[in-house]
Every structure is written in structure tokens, then in C-alpha cells.
Amino acid sequence: MVSWIHFLSQMADEPVLWDLKKIAEIAYRAESLEFNEPGGMMDQYTTSIGGFIHLESQPSIKIEKINAKLGTFILGDSLEPKDTMRVLFRCKDSRLELMKKLEFRNPGIDFKSCSSNHDLTNLDNDEKELYFGTIKNKEILNEALLELNKDKIDHKIIGELLNDHHSVLRDILQISTEKIENMLEAALNAGAYGGKINGSGGGGCMFAYAPDNPEKVAEAIKNAGGETYLIHSDIGTQIEK
């Protein structure tokens, strides 16, 4: 969709010179908003801009380019269908309701400001677990940003942070599957530094971070029943002349 929009913008009777952020915005509107479909905007912005990015969507779109050289990832397709609506209810809708509930005792609280210091007395145990999982994910993100912006990245730390993030997705948000777990375990045993389920979860794909011996890790994921693709960071959409 991103490349198609870029192409059409140049082939129009009156071509427009949209920047990469504008192309990403239109792709997101076409894929999600137009059809009232759930989902984030990271795919469209990453595809358009290229490389590694950090995207903040609130209060407005803010994008930070990350010039990290991480090497090879292996995308593993479990071939399992995804139950996106069920997953998003747990991951998105439930957490939005959680923030509304917390607002009563914690005026102004949001996903960016939430911490363990807020008043949680009106939450039940399941809601508290979901809340602390949200905080943990935020902490993992901040640790990863610090590491990725270093001149010399510790690739094993990046792998460990991916594992930590997956633990939250599996144990608290409950979006992993038995097959995905088997594929991740096989990847780690074969030498991957880390990995996690990809996208909304509930099936679909996982990825493993394996800058060393990626072919060995890919073979292990195949043996666990997945289809594999070796992937690297690349440039975004562009017009070749």
C-alpha cells in the first residue's frame, strides 16, 4: 500500500511531492481507518521511512530515526490463523478501560505517565496484573532505546529485552500460542539472542534476533513447524530513476 500510494502520487496528472510521513499517514488511513479495522500505524511508517524508528502517536505523531546496525532477524510464520479481535480486546480495549477506571483516583493518568506510584486501590488483581504489564513494557522500551542509541550496541542485551517483552505478551497479555512458544524455544536453543511473537499475536508470526549463525536458527524454526525468512533493515519507499 505504501509503495502504491507513492507511485500514484507521482503518476497523477498533477504529481504531488509528499514526504515519507505523509505517505505513511495516507497508507494508514487507507488500510485501517477507511475500513474501520483495528491496528496500529507502525507498519506503514516503518515501510515508508525505512530503517529502525521509534514512533510516538500521542499527543501527535513523533518519529525518531534509530541508526542502529543490528544484523539479521529471522521471521517465522507459524501458519496459524490469528484471532485479531480477541487479542485486541485484551491488549487494547481492556487497557483503555483500565485507564478510564484509574482516572477517578489519578487525574490525568495516561499510558505515558503511568507508574507503580499511582493509586491502584480500585483495581482487581487481574487489572493490576495488566497495569503492571503495561509499565513493564514501557520500561523495556526505554531500556531498548538507550541501548540502540549507543555507539557500540550490546546485541545480547537487545535479545534479552526481546525475551522480556515476549514474557509480558505471553504471560500477562496472553497472546502467544503453543506453536509460537515451540518455535521461539527452538530459535533460542539454536543460538538466537532473543525473540518474540510478532504483531497482534494469537497466531501468525514470531521473529528471532540472530546476528550470528542465522541459517542455523532458521533451520531450527523450520524443524519446529514454521516457515522462515531471513530479514534485515532496509530503506523505505523511493522512486528509482
Spans of features found by a protein language model:
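Broad gene-expression machinery/nucleic-acid interaction feature
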Residues: 41, 73, 205
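Short Gly/Ser/Thr- and Asp/Glu-enriched loop/turn motifs at secondary-structure junctions
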Residues: 199-203
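Alpha/beta catalytic cores of group-transfer enzymes, especially the acyltransferase/condensing modules
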Residues: 12-67, 195-198
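DPxDG-like acidic metal-binding loop motif
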Residues: 1-15
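C-terminal nucleotide
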Residues: 25, 46, 54-194, 208-241
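Short alpha-helical patches at coil-to-helix transitions and adjacent helical residues
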Residues: 1-2, 20, 39, 177
